[in-house]
């Protein structure tokens, strides 16, 4: 789809959506996004130029269907997949990709750390994906030196970052905000550093006693990104890994640096979103969202969860969806899903489905609460179908039609019950919605209340057979 769109851009020094927007040019990607989001094209251009919206769209990701992440667009959901040294293979990851797209993921991150050829699995995923693909390049940087921190140098990081851009990665998590002076602030935490990328860089800085190379070479990374229109997802290496550590000095010190880096990237006309926590008590979620907006000049916020309790292993998709819905309501632009396997193991395809549906619910709830135009239309349509006992339409309008039908059919599988005015919860005699109270009945009742008062009412026969 995008071949003709990007043909004239290749070879230029800056092909980012922000660069074109700041020149007053509306790209084909902006037009596509405007149509998908039901927004004026001019507004999309203005939001991208300002940095409040990103359109992750690497010029080498040809089958991409462009989408937007930002406060002016609907709340988005990211799904994570990826092979590890202990589990999975390419076919399994492609199966997860298909499920993620089927159940509505807006973006997808390949977090593979080993067990497969990392370049091969990434290329396969990008070629098969219509949604933006993100990566964490420090994983492969470490893998390229066989896990040896001592052998890992600054150029290794930049080499892998550019390789990912060349392959068509749309956004990369760059852990440039973690500074060597932040590391002592971790003392006193219960869980310390829980970011894999942050952990790698912390070890590198402690071994070499040098500043974070992703920070010192940040302008070089910007030069790479703008040639491919790769978007920064600035990683939060010091995100809290438990409620105790939330909103602490370490987290907020890094956030301040992330804000500075956001503005540095914008000077290069490179798109930026900023990652956030993590594990956060419910009463601190609004503070975290507002603080990010303040420090990062309203760059789109992209949060992992946050989980609102630490005691839900096996159910962390539920705990985190609660926090995600709140974060979305307060203005977070994209929610990174959590699966039931979080903290326990590598998710399988069914875990991907469970996590994604939980987060589609959270994102949709946030859109409804923020009164986005048309956000509640589907809810109202399903409610009308429910009132009319149109079971097939209810299934069709559900976020997970297969699950809705499965649960209905467990007790009433015969086709005749698809027209029944009850389900197995209430049965035919106790469902309040099949009580035939009509508008005419209510009008008659209201007339009597207005003329006589409630104490003097005479019986009104309902339009219902007894």
Curated annotation (Swiss-Prot):
GO terms for molecular function: 4 iron, 4 sulfur cluster binding; carbon-carbon lyase activity; zinc ion binding. The lineage of its organism: Bacteria, Bacillati, Cyanobacteriota, Cyanophyceae, Synechococcales. It comes from Prochlorococcus marinus (strain NATL2A). This is Phosphomethylpyrimidine synthase. It is an enzyme of class 4 (lyase). The gene is thiC. Zn(2+) binds at residues 279, 343. GO terms for cellular component: cytosol. Keywords: 4Fe-4S, Iron, Iron-sulfur, Lyase, Metal-binding, S-adenosyl-L-methionine, Thiamine biosynthesis, Zinc. Substrate binds at residues 80, 109, 139, 175, 195-197, 236-239, 275, 302. Disulfide bonds: none annotated.
């Amino acid at each position: 789809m995008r071949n003709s769109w990007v043909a004239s851009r290749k070879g230029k020094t800056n092909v980012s959506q922000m660069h074109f927007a700041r020149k007053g040019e509306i790209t084909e990607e902006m037009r596509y996004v405007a149509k998908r989001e039901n927004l004026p094209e001019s507004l999309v251009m203005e939001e991208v130029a300002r940095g409040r919206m990103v359109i992750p769209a690497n010029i080498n990701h040809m089958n991409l269907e462009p989408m937007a992440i930002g406060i002016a667009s609907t709340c988005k959901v990211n799904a994570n997949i990826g092979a590890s040294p202990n589990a999975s293979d390419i076919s399994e990851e492609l199966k997860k990709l298909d499920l993620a797209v089927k159940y509505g993921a807006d973006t997808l991150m390949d977090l593979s750390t080993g067990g497969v050829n990392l370049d091969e699995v990434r290329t396969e995923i990008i070629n098969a994906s219509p949604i933006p693909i993100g990566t964490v390049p420090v994983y492969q940087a470490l893998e390229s030196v066989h896990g040896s921190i001592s052998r890992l140098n600054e150029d290794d990081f930049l080499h892998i970052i550019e390789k990912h851009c060349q392959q068509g990665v749309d956004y990369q998590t760059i852990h440039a905000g973690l500074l060597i002076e932040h590391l002592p602030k971790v003392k006193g935490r219960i869980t310390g550093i829980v970011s894999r990328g942050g952990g790698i860089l912390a070890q590198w800085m402690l071994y070499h006693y040098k500043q974070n190379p992703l920070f010192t070479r940040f302008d070089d990374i910007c030069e790479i990104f703008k040639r491919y229109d790769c978007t920064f997802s600035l990683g939060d290496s010091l995100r809290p890994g438990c409620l105790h550590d939330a909103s602490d000095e370490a987290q907020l010190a890094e956030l301040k640096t992330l804000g500075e880096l956001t503005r540095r990237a914008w000077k290069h006309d490179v798109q930026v979103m900023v990652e956030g926590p993590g594990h956060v008590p419910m009463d601190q979620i609004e503070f975290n969202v507002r603080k990010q907006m303040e420090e990062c000049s309203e760059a789109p916020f992209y949060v992992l969860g946050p989980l609102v309790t630490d005691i839900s292993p096996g159910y962390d998709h539920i705990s985190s969806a609660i926090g995600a819905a709140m974060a979305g309501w307060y203005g977070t632009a994209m929610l990174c899903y959590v699966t039931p396997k979080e903290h326990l193991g590598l998710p399988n395809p069914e875990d991907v489905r469970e996590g994604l549906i939980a987060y589609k619910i959270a994102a949709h709830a946030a859109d409804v609460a923020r009164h986005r135009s048309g956000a509640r239309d589907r809810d109202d349509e399903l409610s009308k179908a429910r009132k009319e006992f149109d079971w097939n339409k209810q299934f069709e309008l559900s976020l997970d039609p297969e699950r809705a039908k499965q649960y209905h059919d467990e007790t009433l599988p015969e086709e005749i019950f698809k027209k029944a005015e009850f389900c197995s919860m209430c049965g035919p005699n106790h469902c309040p919605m099949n009580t035939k109270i009509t508008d005419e009945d209510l009008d008659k009742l209201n007339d009597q209340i207005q003329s006589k008062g409630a104490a003097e009412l005479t019986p009104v026969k309902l339009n219902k057979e007894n």
